[in-house]
């Protein structure tokens, strides 16, 4: 019977307002989450991989004459020509530079041609007409496990596809050289024959080996613990801000609190918006320290804290404070709508652009653009550097720190300016309906 007292016009707002808001928010959620996971290889762009050619070349006998060859250079040139430039950022570097790029999380993997590649390929050609077991020359496809398991799979598939074509080209060339050598056998002498097994080996002369560069230790979760740690920090900041905002407002009398069937609504406290925000910020800072310590304790118990627990704790506190204070400033500026804004910025847009599961180079370009400033990506880079790259400043920790400080600065300035402005304009936290009744 109580529902009959609600005016029909208000029923429209009760039913359609949440329907419209949720349709918009959840449609955005569907687009972001399904778009970033639907076709990673089709979305590839600027995916960085190193190509290292250490081959020093060799002198081989071809048709009765010696010839200086460098099969490694031929393979490298074929790989450069065969890689789609719009998808792969192939960096031709030396082994030292490749190691540096791996350490600083600048590349997802590397294709390494060893120094004795030409020599071993020449031995394989000679050995094809004599007895005995001969090993095929090796090219190594290295993956960077700290960049995540999905990126390792992409590197492996790219390397295998490229090397299949190169293997065929080198096999045809090597087979032709062996046949030319056999054709130069002196008249009257019996020319050696290439056995069927040797022909198969010559057709695919390169053995491609997949290998992890510096495998992660136990507790790394195949490179996913950094992502989940970053997710924990973001969720603690967003949920923590929401809980603190609600509970502090309840204690100050700005909104009621329900405990099961009990309903409590304290009288409003005469306090400005600015000072209310300062109280919430202070509580958030204290909570951030406590939660970060609890996270570290849980991580230590589960063995996923890595080798840099102090750095992990300090960065967690910084990131959590930055996220929490930003969410508080949003709630102070937009009120209840700030909850949806925080959800959109930190979760809906943040998780797909984090690169914690699918690399940003394997997502649509608009998601990669979001990663330039989305908070979760910055936190993930810092966590990844601490857990997998020995807190290397250039591996993402530096960016994570500076972007967290920038976010903190924006939150402080924005929160102070907007609450001061509301207070200056006399926009106090009071019930407008009651105010109109009193005025009447």
Language model segments and positions:
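Extracytoplasmic/periplasmic domains immediately adjacent to an N-terminal transmembrane anchor
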Residues: 1-219, 425-440
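Hydrophobic/aromatic residues in alpha-helical transmembrane segments
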Residues: 28-29, 240, 294, 326
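Hydrophobic, membrane-facing alpha-helical anchors
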Residues: 182-193, 264-268, 289-301
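N-terminal membrane-entry
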Residues: 217-237
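Membrane-spanning alpha-helical segments of multipass transporters and channels
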Residues: 228, 272, 277-440
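Hydrophobic core segments of alpha-helical transmembrane domains
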Residues: 233-241, 411-415
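Juxtamembrane interface at the cytosolic side of transmembrane helices
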Residues: 236-289
